[in-house]
Amino acid sequence: MTISQNPTLDTFKGLFNEAEFVYRHLGSNDAKQADLLSAIGYKDMATFINDTVPEPVRLHKELDLPVAMSEHAALAKLRTMADDITVNKSYIGQGYSPVRMPAVIQRNVLENPGWYTAYTPYQAEIAQGRLEALLNFQQVCIDLTGLELAGASLLDEATAAAEAMAMSKRVSKSKSMQFFVDDRVYSQTLDVINTRAKYFGWEVVVGDFELAKSGDYFGALFQYVGVEGDVKDLTDVIAAVKKNKTYVNVVSDIMSLVLLKSPADMGADVALGSTQRFGIPMGFGGPHAAYFAFSDKAKRSAPGRIIGVSKDSQGNTALRMALQTREQHIRREKANSNICTSQVLLANLAGMYAVYHGPGGVKRIATRIHAFATAFADVIKNANDSNLNVVHDQFFDSVVIDCGSEKLATQIFENADNVGYNLWRLGDSKLSVAFSETSDQEDFKILTQLFVTKAHDLPEDARISLDSTHLRTDDILTHPVFNSHHTEHEMLRYLKSLEDKDLAMNRSMISLGSCTMKLNATSEMLPITWPEFANVHPFAPRDQVTGYVAMIDSLQEQLKAITGFDDVSMQPNSGASGEYAGLLAIRRYHESLGETDRDVCLIPMSAHGTNPATAMMMGMKVVVVKTDDNGNVDIDDLTAKSEEHSARLGALMITYPSTHGVFEEGIRKICDLIHKHGGQVYMDGANMNAQVGMMQPADVGADVLHMNLHKTFCIPHGGGGPGMGPIGMKSHLAPFMANHTLSPVHNAQKDCSAVSAAPYGSASILPISWMYIAMMGRDGLLKATELALLNANYVAAELKDYYPVLYTGKNGRVAHECIIDIRPLKEETGISESDIAKRLMDYGFHSPTMSFPVAGTLMIEPTESESKEELDRFISALKSIKAEAMKAKAGEDNWTLENNPLVNAPHTAAMVIDGEWTYPYSRETAAFPLPYIRTNKFWPSVARVDDAYGDKNLMCSCPSIENYM
C-alpha cells in the first residue's frame, strides 16, 4: 500500500499529504486497526483478508484509478469542470423550472447532516421529526390535489406516471389491456410509460384527450397543464371515461394547482407530478420528489411510502410508516411496486417551502409567475406582428408562440442563447417561453425585445388571464403548520425542533445491514449547491453542459475501473430503478437474439425484496432457489432449476457477498451455470462495499450490476432518499441500456426507452460520488473495503458468545456484515428482535436491520467509517441488553418477562420524569443503563408506537395541534 497515515515531514510530498482524506474517512487509524486485528486473532491485514475473501474471486492487481487527492485538490479539479458549464437563464419548462430555495431551508435542512444522514424511518420512535416533515409534504399534496390521501414521495414525475398506470390496472374493473395517454404529456413521461407497459403486455394509446371518451381503457392519464402550457378543463372528459370503468390519473404542475381547480374537483382518481417547483433546484434532472395523491378506497393499491398518524404506548400521538404490507420488503413479487427508497430529503424540502411561505406566500409566487406569462403574451398580441401568434389563450406559466416560419423561430432561439436565455422549441416554427419564480423585470425586457424588437417594461397592474372557470375557489394550506413559521426565527426553531427528534449519523453509528451507512463527508457534499451543478436544466443545449457531461463521464470511467464492466448507464435514480434497468437490458438483449420467451428469473430465497418485485415488473416468472444451512445458494437446487427452465431461463439475480453476509466460494461456478443455460447474471450491488478493490463483479461472471451510490459511494441516504442506482454492464448488453427521447445516450439503441425522467437521473448528486472516489484513490478504496470487513468481523467476534452469529464463511469469517440470531433468546425469554431494537434507542443507537434476510435476527453492518470506540459502545449496549433479558427471566429485583426495560422500551424523557414511576427498575436503568450515555444522551420523542392501531385507523394528513398537547 502506498498510503501512510503518518507521512514523513522532510519532503514536500509528505508535508502536502495528498492522501490525508483517507484517514478522515476511515474510522480507525493504523494502530487501532492493529488492535482490531489482534482482538480476532490476526497479526496483519493480509492474513485476515486471505481467510475472509475466497481466493478465486480476489483481484490481484491495482484498480486502474489515480492515487488519492486531497480535499482541496479534488474540489479544485471539480471546479474546473463546473467552470465549463454555462448557466443560462432557463425558460425551457417541460417539467423543470428555476426556483429560489429559501436560505433558511438550504442551510438547516439540505446542508444539515441531522437531516441528510438519517435512514428511512422504519424505527418511528427516533424519526418523529422526519415523519412530521413528510406528513407536512403529504398535507400539501392533499390540499392542492383535493384528494383524500397522498404518499411520501416517488422518484420523479415520469416514474410516478408509470406507477399510476400500474395502479390503474390493479384498481380498475375494466378488462381492457389498453392505457390511454393524453398527447399533451411531456415526452419523457411518455417514454417511461412505454418502457413500463411493454412487459406487462399493455398497449399505450396516445391521442387528443377528447378521444379518451370513446375507447375502452383500463386507465387514462391526462396532463394538466399541457406540454404547450395550455390549460384545459378535464371535468367532462373525466366524467365520460369513468362511465367506461376507466381509472383516471391527472399529471399536474404543483405550482399551477395553487391557482387552478384541483384534479379532484374534476373527478380524478389519482393526481401526480413533480414538486420540484417548491424550492428544489433543477439539478440537470434531479433529484426531485414526485407526489402521488389518491382516494381512500385505493390506499392499499398505492405505490411507495405512506406516513400515517398512530399513538404510542403512553397514548400520545405518534407518526409511522403506514400500510407497509403493500411494499416489496414484505410482499416481494406480490408488492404493488419495487420502490424501496424514494425522495424523502427532497419531499421534506418541498414541504418546508410550503411551511415557510404559507398559503399567502405560495399564492403570491404562483400569481406572479402567471402574471409574468400573461404580460408577456399581451406584448406579443399587441405588437400586431402577423408573423407572431400566441397559440393558447388559457395558460399558467408557458406562452407558446408560433413564429410563422422555421427561419424566424431559429433566429429568435439563437438570439436568446446569445444573450444568455434558453427557450424551448416545439416543432418547426413554435417557441415556448416558460416563466418561473425567478423571472424578473430584466428578463421581461430582454425576452420582449427578442420577439418584438423593443424592450418592454412590466405593466403596473398584474393581470390574471385565466378564465374564472379554471380557478380554484377553496382554501389551501389551512393547517396551523402552514400558518405559523413565516419569520426566519420561527422557521429556524421549527426545523431544529424536528431535527432534535431524529437519530442520524451525526449522533451515533447506524449499523443497518445491507444499507452501508458510511460517512458522508462535508467536502463531498459542498458541490451539490454550486450553481453550475444545481441550476442547469436537464434539456439545456449540449454545448452549455460540457463540464457537467465531463464530470459524469469521469465518474462513469471511475465506476468502470472499479467494477470491470465495459459500460455504465447513469440514468437509474435509485437502486430499485437500477435493478429494473438491468433486467430491462437483459430482456432486450434476449429479444435481439430472437429469444423472446426467456422470461424465467431465478432468485435465491434470501434475496432483497426488490429483486422479485422488479422481476415481476419485467413480466418475468420468479423461480425461487433454496439456500443451504451455511447461507449459500444451494448449488444442487440451482442446477436442477436451471436445467428445468433452460429453454426459458432469462436471468439469475444474485447478491454478492450474499445477503447472509458471507462470500460464497462458488460464485464463478454459479455464473458459469447460468451462462451454460443461456441466461444472464444480474448482480445486486447492495453489498458492493465488500467488493471495491478486492474483486470485480465483471471478473467473476456478472453480466450487469447496479451500484448503490447512496451506499458504497457516499451519497447520503437523506432519511429515505435520494439515491442513485447506475448499472455497469458488459459490452453485449450496452446497446440495450435505457436511452432518452430528448437527450440520447451515447451507446444505447435509439428504440430503447427510458427508465427515469432525466437522461442522467439525479445528476446533481453525482459530484458526491466523484469526490469520494477521487479523494480515496485506488489504495484508499481498498483500505476502506478491508476495514469494512474487519469491523464486521470484530463485531461478530465480540458478540458471538452472547448471540449466535448465524452465517460465516469456511474460515469462520463474515463479510462486511453479520447476522446475529435472536430466536434462541426469544424462545428462552420471550424477548424479541423488536424489543432489542427499541431498547437500543435508550442506549443511543439505531437498530440494525431487523428480520432480514432471516426472521428473528438482526443484521449488523458497521462500515469502515466507524471508530473502534463507537463499535465498542455498540457492542457493550448489546451485551448489556442480553444481561437485561436474562435478569428479567430470572425475576431478579422484581423484574418479569412482562415488565422490564426491554418490553417497555424506548423510554422518553416524559416517562422518566413522570411523578409516578411504576416500573420495577430505576429511572436510571431506563434512561442511562451504561455510563457513556450520560455524555451524549438521545431521548426518543415518543414511546413505542402502536403499528396495528395506525393501520386500522389510517390517517395520513396533519393532525390538529391539540393531538400533540
From Swiss-Prot:
<protein>
    <recommendedName>
        <fullName>Glycine dehydrogenase (decarboxylating)</fullName>
        <ecNumber>1.4.4.2</ecNumber>
    </recommendedName>
</protein>
<dbReference type="InterPro" id="IPR015422">
    <property type="entry name" value="PyrdxlP-dep_Trfase_small"/>
</dbReference>
<dbReference type="InterPro" id="IPR015421">
    <property type="entry name" value="PyrdxlP-dep_Trfase_major"/>
</dbReference>
<comment type="function">
    <text>The glycine cleavage system catalyzes the degradation of glycine. The P protein binds the alpha-amino group of glycine through its pyridoxal phosphate cofactor; CO(2) is released and the remaining methylamine moiety is then transferred to the lipoamide cofactor of the H protein.</text>
</comment>
<feature type="modified residue" description="N6-(pyridoxal phosphate)lysine">
    <location>
        <position position="711"/>
    </location>
</feature>
<dbReference type="Pfam" id="PF21478">
    <property type="entry name" value="GcvP2_C"/>
</dbReference>
<dbReference type="InterPro" id="IPR003437">
    <property type="entry name" value="GcvP"/>
</dbReference>
<dbReference type="InterPro" id="IPR020581">
    <property type="entry name" value="GDC_P"/>
</dbReference>
<comment type="subunit">
    <text>The glycine cleavage system is composed of four proteins: P, T, L and H.</text>
</comment>
<dbReference type="GO" id="GO:0030170">
    <property type="term" value="F:pyridoxal phosphate binding"/>
</dbReference>
<dbReference type="GO" id="GO:0019464">
    <property type="term" value="P:glycine decarboxylation via glycine cleavage system"/>
</dbReference>
<keyword id="KW-0560">Oxidoreductase</keyword>
<dbReference type="Pfam" id="PF00266">
    <property type="entry name" value="Aminotran_5"/>
</dbReference>
<dbReference type="InterPro" id="IPR000192">
    <property type="entry name" value="Aminotrans_V_dom"/>
</dbReference>
<dbReference type="Pfam" id="PF02347">
    <property type="entry name" value="GDC-P"/>
</dbReference>
<dbReference type="GO" id="GO:0005960">
    <property type="term" value="C:glycine cleavage complex"/>
</dbReference>
<dbReference type="InterPro" id="IPR015424">
    <property type="entry name" value="PyrdxlP-dep_Trfase"/>
</dbReference>
<keyword id="KW-0663">Pyridoxal phosphate</keyword>
<dbReference type="GO" id="GO:0004375">
    <property type="term" value="F:glycine dehydrogenase (decarboxylating) activity"/>
</dbReference>
<dbReference type="InterPro" id="IPR049316">
    <property type="entry name" value="GDC-P_C"/>
</dbReference>
<comment type="similarity">
    <text>Belongs to the GcvP family.</text>
</comment>
<dbReference type="InterPro" id="IPR049315">
    <property type="entry name" value="GDC-P_N"/>
</dbReference>
<dbReference type="GO" id="GO:0005829">
    <property type="term" value="C:cytosol"/>
</dbReference>
<dbReference type="GO" id="GO:0016594">
    <property type="term" value="F:glycine binding"/>
</dbReference>
